[in-house]
Amino acid sequence: MGVQANTRAIEKDIVTDFSERMSYASYLDLDTLLSAQKPVSRPEHHDELLFIIQHQTTELWLKLVLHETLAARAAFDEDDIGRALKCVARVKHIQKTLTEQWSVLATLTPTEYSEFRRFLGNSSGFQSYQYRAVEFVLGNKNAGMLAVFEADPAAHDLLGRLLAEPSLYDAFWQCLSRLGYDVPASALDRDVTAAYTLNEDLLPLIKFVYENHDEHWAVYEAFEEFVDLEENFQLWRFRHMRTVLRTIGMKSGTGGSSGVGFLQKALDLTFFPELLAVRTEIGR
């Protein structure tokens, strides 16, 4: 039976009584979720709701990214490359959503933003502890960042713990070592609290896998998944920088940074540098 009078009939078995059942709204705690948007501008500016929702949804996605990257690290700890890459694959899709989401915020014009920006005080996306947590898990660690979160003990403790723990990339190399690959000691014994930097000792092994990928497919696939992960992260950073540029130009950020100039520097930060460096060597 088709639609009559442009109305879809409710099927007889569809549940409508939720007086004693869990509903969609109660499962998702929508009362709490939808009351979490609290504009601070006075009088309330129409476009501030967009600004809040943009950042709140980003935080929700970052929560899932952190959940999946930690699960991937745990899978590497158990030498389960396939399960780890399943988590990474999901993260890659989330990253694409996060990057495209900047196009929504880009509808906020410089004039509109300037009308409520002063009400934000020193609050800034730079203070997103989940974003820093993801960076730490991926290996871009910076102990100095913890100072930003001294007033938030839970965030400070989380970042302190992640700073001291091996990154996803560290766990991967440990996994390969246990599986019999000749991973150099410099990769296995490094200071995991430091930001990851290029380790040329790894290049021969990486090149070997690329040039013999049929015999080492799981590791080869992992290399390419990591490259995707980093590229997606850099595309997000670039869209962030460009959105800020079109919205506030070269003004300083609300949190005290130089703004666009500071964001541009993030484009030089890397997670898996050997996987790009090896491309120069392949085929030589």
Curated annotation (Swiss-Prot):
Pathway of action: Amino-acid degradation; L-tryptophan degradation via kynurenine pathway; L-kynurenine from L-tryptophan: step 1/2
InterPro entries: Trp/Indoleamine_2_3_dOase-like, Trp_2_3_dOase
Necessary cofactors: heme
EC assignment: 1.13.11.11
Record's cofactor remark: Binds 1 heme group per subunit.
GO molecular function: heme binding; metal ion binding; tryptophan 2,3-dioxygenase activity
Keywords: Dioxygenase, Heme, Iron, Metal-binding, Oxidoreductase, Tryptophan catabolism
Annotated positions binding substrate: F51, I52, I53, Q54, H55, Y113, R117, T254
EC top class named in words: oxidoreductase
Domain of life: Bacteria
GO BP terms in the entry: L-tryptophan catabolic process to acetyl-CoA; L-tryptophan catabolic process to kynurenine
Catalysed transformations (reactions): L-tryptophan + O2 = N-formyl-L-kynurenine
Ligand binding (heme): H240
Similarity section: Belongs to the tryptophan 2,3-dioxygenase family.
Biological function: Heme-dependent dioxygenase that catalyzes the oxidative cleavage of the L-tryptophan (L-Trp) pyrrole ring and converts L-tryptophan to N-formyl-L-kynurenine. Catalyzes the oxidative cleavage of the indole moiety.
Assembly notes: Homotetramer.
Protein name as annotated: Tryptophan 2,3-dioxygenase
